């Protein structure tokens, strides 16, 4: 059993929403290679109204708790949040020794939280909110929707840990005395095999693309979806299934040469880093505060630029985001947003 100390840094003022059921512990990773655990905690403390989880793991096996368990946290989308007993973020590192410690504690913490909630130590099993277990953010996106995130598998894979290995390590940790120590991991990143040992027919879109050494980022999947004629791609399970089928079928064959994009008419909207956050709204509802589904955070990225999908007038635009899909945003000049050609 791996020992760790929980650093209590509960964010003040968090809501205490009642769960519909303590069915999940959600496994995340931060997707920010340039940030530390302290930076992640600090950022979430300042911006919890956009999203928050319960725990961070990083910095060589440190655990920082920022929210109480057994309440609704806002880290996995509208369909999973109200069933999530806890949500855990694994911070990124480029140091092999640090990763080994982080991963060991990550597995132990996920198992410990699941046991406290009476949740079975299974990974990504089932397809409904009633199917209890430890769930990845990818499982939520693929099975429940409400999010397009695919973590933590790409990051774990970069250190030679497959989904099957992750599941095995969770099971070993759950055995307590049967493990003796935490699952042993290589001290250096394991090289990716030239030929995947996994049965490719059983892989989802992102895992399949990773196995084929393809760029599995949302932006590239969105690009491929357009090439294959999948309209309004937002990363839903059905769209991913269709895209996977088309990728397996070979390169797209347009009947006519694809026209070059017109740079003169494609306008973009720029959100500067020093003007705070911009709330986003569904495309089928009025862009008012009560309908906000989240916010984009230009400060975190030094500014953000999006192609305008549709100008709805009065300073309201439709944009395509990685986190929320296609949404409305209010970008009038008074907000500090800038329209560019």
Curated annotation (Swiss-Prot):
The keyword Glycosyltransferase does not apply. It catalyses: Hydrolyzes the link between N-acetylmuramoyl residues and L-amino acid residues in certain cell-wall glycopeptides. Its main location: secreted. SMART domains: Ami_2 (SM00644). GO terms for cellular component: extracellular region. CDD domains: PGRP (cd06583). Coiled coil: none annotated. Gene3D superfamilies: Peptidoglycan recognition protein-like. Keywords: Antimicrobial, Bacteriolytic enzyme, Hydrolase, Repeat, Secreted. Residues 23-153 form the N-acetylmuramoyl-L-alanine amidase domain. GO terms for biological process: defense response to bacterium; peptidoglycan catabolic process; symbiont-mediated cytolysis of host cell. Its EC number is 3.5.1.28. GO terms for molecular function: N-acetylmuramoyl-L-alanine amidase activity. It comes from the Viruses. The keyword Ribosomal protein does not apply. It is an enzyme of class 3 (hydrolase). Residues 175-201, 248-267 are annotated as: Disordered. It is found in: Secreted. InterPro entries: Amidase/PGRP_sf (IPR036505), Amidase_domain (IPR002502). Belongs to the N-acetylmuramoyl-L-alanine amidase 2 family. This is Endolysin. The gene is PLY511.
């Amino acid at each position: 059993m791996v020992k760790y100390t929980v650093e209590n840094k509960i964010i003040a003022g968090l809501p205490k929403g009642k769960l519909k059921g303590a069915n999940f512990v959600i496994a995340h990773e931060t997707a920010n290679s340039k940030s530390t655990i302290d930076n992640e905690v600090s950022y979430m403390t300042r911006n919890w109204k956009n999203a928050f989880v319960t725990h961070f793991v990083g910095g060589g096996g440190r655990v920082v708790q920022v929210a109480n368990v057994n309440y609704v946290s806002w880290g996995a989308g509208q369909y999973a949040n109200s069933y999530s007993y806890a949500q855990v973020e694994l911070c990124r590192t480029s140091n092999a020794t640090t990763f080994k410690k982080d991963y060991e504690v990550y597995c132990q913490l996920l198992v410990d939280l699941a046991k406290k909630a009476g949740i079975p130590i299974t990974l990504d099993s089932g397809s409904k909110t009633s199917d209890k277990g430890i769930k990845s953010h990818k499982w939520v996106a693929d099975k429940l929707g409400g999010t397009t995130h695919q973590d933590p598998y790409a990051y774990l894979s970069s250190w030679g840990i497959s989904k099957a290995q992750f599941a095995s390590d969770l099971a070993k940790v759950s055995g307590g005395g049967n493990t003796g120590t935490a699952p042993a991991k290589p001290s250096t990143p394991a090289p990716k095999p030239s030929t995947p040992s996994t049965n490719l027919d059983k892989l989802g879109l992102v895992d399949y693309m990773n196995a084929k050494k393809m760029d599995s980022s949302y932006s590239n999947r969105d690009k491929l979806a357009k090439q294959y004629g999948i309209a309004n791609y937002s990363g839903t399970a059905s769209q991913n299934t269709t895209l996977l089928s088309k990728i397996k079928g070979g390169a797209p064959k347009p009947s006519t040469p694809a026209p070059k994009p017109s740079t003169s008419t494609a306008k973009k909207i720029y959100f500067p880093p020093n003007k705070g956050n911009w709330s986003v709204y569904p495309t089928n509802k009025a862009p008012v505060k009560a309908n906000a589904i989240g916010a984009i955070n230009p400060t975190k990225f030094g500014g953000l630029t999006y192609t305008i999908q549709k100008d709805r007038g009065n300073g309201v635009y439709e944009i395509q985001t990685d986190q929320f899909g296609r949404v409305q945003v209010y970008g009038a000049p008074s907000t500090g947003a800038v329209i560019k050609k």
